[in-house]
């Protein structure tokens, strides 16, 4: 591990998410879906927030608009996302998933649920609640 217990906590949290993502994206790679981690995050967000704008997505993902514009263009080129002009603000585009984009999102959600169950298997309800409380406390420290 590392030189300090605090670093150990952050390291193990990082490694948990790294393994989770690696397992999740094995499915995408092996299933020939041809999307990147960042593209999958966009699909996930737009699926949960149909009609989201690029600005909303930018704030959520903490990425600049230029980077997201490239991601969105790639997803449009792959026919996974549709962008339509916002009738209330012609400078803004509203994003929605295509059927193909929704299909990939559904597969990712199913795989995410399976991996989540795997990750917390063996925890008692009390341990689960304690872990959730502690991780939430760490999360709040970064706000």
Give residue ranges: language-model regions:
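Positions in alpha-helical segments
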Residues: 7, 11, 41, 114-118
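N-terminal leader segment of winged-helix/HTH proteins
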Residues: 1-31
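Generic C-terminal helix-cap and adjacent flexible tail
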Residues: 140-143
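Short, locally clustered residues in the helix-turn-helix/winged-helix DNA-binding domain
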Residues: 17-18, 44-48, 109, 136
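N-terminal helix-turn-helix DNA-binding core of bacterial DNA-binding proteins
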Residues: 22-67, 72
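A cross-family signal for key residues in well-ordered alpha-helices
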Residues: 14, 44, 59, 106, ...
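Charged, amphipathic alpha-helical coiled-coil/dimerization segments
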Residues: 21-26, 73-136
